[in-house]
Amino acid sequence: MEILNWQYGITYAILILTFLSSHEFGHYFAARYYGIQTTLPYYIPFPFPIALNFGTMGAVIRIKEPVTSKKALFDIGIAGPIAGFIVCCIFLIIGLETLPGKEYVYQIHPEYLQNGNGEIPMSGLYFGDTLLYSLFSKLFANPNGFLPPMNEIYHYPFLNVGWFGLFVTAMNLLPMGQLDGGHITYSIFGTKGHYAVSRAFFWLLLILGLLGAMYEWYLYLDETNATTILTGFGRSIYLFFQYFFAKFPILKGMWTGWLVWAILAKFVIRLKHPPVENEDDIGTTRKMLGIFALIMLLGSFSINAIYII
């Protein structure tokens, strides 16, 4: 089997392992600080050649004994996202500061020049834009240079891993169950406050996922000309979707995966957080860090995540 662009693959592998390690070792060292026994990170490979494959299903550590205080829970929960977030920001800055010209894309896709006028197609696999990615693009990319569209950034290891790492960080910071964001939210607001926030985010993800599924169904009907055979109620639903997505174009392209996440959160991760033994207040400094965690979540979250046009 011929292997092309192996140097970019090695760069990507090193970067993604660096991100995963920084996140998991953030948890690890915070747990060890409190004398809590924990394993070293387990890295989960995913080598199967499917359409959407980042080469890994992430990494995990296993905490071998209960966390007994809110302060320890908060510190362990937030250490991983902060460490991973910093690494991803560095990756994005490096990637944007060292962007090659448009000819780099043409080397990978010579057909863009051969079959057209050099314009990059608007179709393909897109990575959803985020507040942080947009901000960094304005701050660090050459304003007179070439900024690759979001359906081409997988050719740029630093941008790709930076985006992917922020996406993973955002998912971990969702304030639900025993995700990192759940630990943080529980430590700040307690059982009732955490459960209220957790339910709100469950409904948010469910709605986003359903909107994504609705739009995909609408596109399928439109592209296959199935609307010509729809009658009665089915055609009424199609016409409603047509009006709805024309009226609110921002709702197009929602990630259907949020529906999967909502189901996992409800039935696997669970929305509630188990209580800890010591529920003493975590103090003002940690609550300020909790606000920073919210900023990380909002800056890294993408409602359409990964989608195809």
Describe the predicted segments one by one.
Residues 1-309:
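Hydrophobic transmembrane alpha-helices and their immediate loop junctions
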